[in-house]
């Protein structure tokens, strides 16, 4: 497929009781900015931790499960593409490679058919600050 857009995202996490709050600030290569705030809860079911999350542009709840160093995070989201609002499904597979690096491969679908994918590399704290400041001047 063709590369459509590139972006960087700065993610800040805070704990509020049993809830994890993730603040995502996006900066796209064309200068567009976006923001998403997740509220994520965990629950133990049959001895395994399951996650559910909500954000303003998420339809229903996101569902997540962890197995080993991998997490699957699935949700329906409303995106604006070429000026048209489109609800799509994201299936994220996030793999923790080291304590400071994770790789996310997200598959995007509509009506059960794949329409795209997103690959992200997450760098934690010091690594991210040294390598990739969230600034278009350093694109």
Report the location of each language-model feature.
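Central antiparallel beta-sheet cores of small beta-barrel/beta-sandwich binding domains
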Residues: 2-81, 93
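Glycine-rich, aromatic-bearing surface loops/beta-hairpins
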Residues: 91-139
């Amino acid at each position: 497929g063709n590369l459509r857009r590139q972006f960087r995202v700065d993610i800040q996490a805070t704990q509020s009781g049993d809830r994890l709050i993730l603040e995502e600030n996006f900066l796209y290569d064309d200068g567009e900015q976006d923001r998403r705030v997740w509220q994520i809860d965990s629950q133990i079911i049959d001895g395994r931790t399951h996650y559910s999350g909500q954000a303003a542009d998420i339809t229903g709840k996101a569902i997540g499960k962890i197995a080993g160093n991998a997490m699957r995070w699935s949700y329906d989201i409303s995106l604006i593409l070429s000026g048209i609002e489109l609800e799509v499904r994201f299936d994220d597979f996030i793999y923790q490679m080291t304590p400071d690096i994770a790789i996310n491969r997200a598959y995007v679908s509509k009506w059960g058919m794949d329409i795209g994918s997103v690959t992200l590399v997450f760098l934690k704290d010091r690594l991210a600050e040294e390598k990739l400041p969230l600034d278009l001047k350093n694109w």
